[in-house]
Amino acid sequence: FSGDFCDSSLCLNGGTCLLDQDPQKPFHCLCPEGFTGLICNETEKGPCFPNPCHNDAECEVIDDAHRGDVFTEYICKCPHGYTGIHCEIICNAPLGMETGAIADFQISASSMHLGFMGLQRWAPELARLHRAGIVNAWTASNYDRNPWIQVNLLRRMRVTGVVTQGASRAGSAEYMKTFKVAYSTDGRKFQFIQGAEESGDKIFMGNLDNSGLKVNLFEVPLEVQYVRLVPIICHRGCTLRFELLGCELSGCAEPLGLKDNTIPNKQITASSFYRTWGLSAFSWYPFYARLDNQGKFNAWTAQSNSASEWLQIDLGSQRRVTGIITQGARDFGHIQYVAAYKVAYSDDGVSWTEYRDQGALEGKIFPGNLDNNSHKKNMFETPFLTRFVRILPVAWHNRITLRVELLGC
């Protein structure tokens, strides 16, 4: 090559023309990705052309020597927040610290601060993002030289990031300025996320004040049951509210359309519904049973407290259902919720099958809510393909009252 450019119109599809000293071939085309041939007129074929990966993911060809037991000819390198073979699954959903889907017993810490003569417990279960109140976060003991707080997710999940927030204690801002993240599959042996190029444990940047949010996404998603945050530098005290981001390992746990109203009202029905003081204007209709629904009448309430009552969702077509989130509500100050329930499913809305664990003879009873507002998430060990889903209350507090979301794909 002479290194000089020539008329690029000689090369098609955006190719760059370079002069060549060979008289047989006076110019050479540098073809853009996806094109080949003397004048870039042929579409390049191969496992990565066209790119099979979604969401701007990079496609990398695997050569035969390194393929081993991997039968695909390529892998997709997913950008932050995506997962799946083709990076088609969004994996940065809040895992439940803020909503209460992660229960108090799942959160533990090395220590906690006891304030105001020991009456104020800055306990680990308070470390929930945006939690309000005077005592509204976790604070490590002043005497704890190696503080940490951890979450047991109860099963292996894909964890892709963390959102941290400080709090105000005794009128002063306290927060975590830098921290490490450790993880474990068994709760005994922990490893730290590593920095780039063997630089040791990765140090994450934390907060700058007591109320702002700091999002840190992990370079490589974790597939773990336990996640531990380890403060390194704190402002005044090691005080923390936080949320974990990620998704189920299956990737099939997206909301199926109750909360966002993609399931229309007519597809949400029930055995009956309650009218406060018998007035139609004060009806707790089935289609109010949408997770986090707001308003004075914001949930489904059954007419009677009976195990024969049910709430039914028609998904419109057959879907793979992998889990459920339930929530109670409040009726003029009275806290109401379903404390335990069964799940049934049907393809035609007539013939029903109660969900049961593998090998079980009876329908599984799922633990429900403990209050009117927290989320309670239950995942099905054996997901099912269905169109119709029924929730069958077994135990309740005050009245049978439900807000709900189904999960799946």
From Swiss-Prot:
Pfam families: EGF (PF00008), F5_F8_type_C (PF00754). The keyword Glycoprotein applies. Residues 2-41, 44-88 form the EGF-like domain. It is found in: Membrane; Secreted; Cytoplasmic vesicle, Secretory vesicle, Acrosome membrane. Contributes to phagocytic removal of apoptotic cells in many tissues. Plays an important role in the maintenance of intestinal epithelial homeostasis and the promotion of mucosal healing. Promotes VEGF-dependent neovascularization. Specific ligand for the alpha-v/beta-3 and alpha-v/beta-5 receptors. Also binds to phosphatidylserine-enriched cell surfaces in a receptor-independent manner. Zona pellucida-binding protein which may play a role in gamete interaction. The F5/8 type C 2 domain mediates high-affinity binding to phosphatidylserine-containing membranes. This is Lactadherin. It comes from Sus scrofa (Pig).
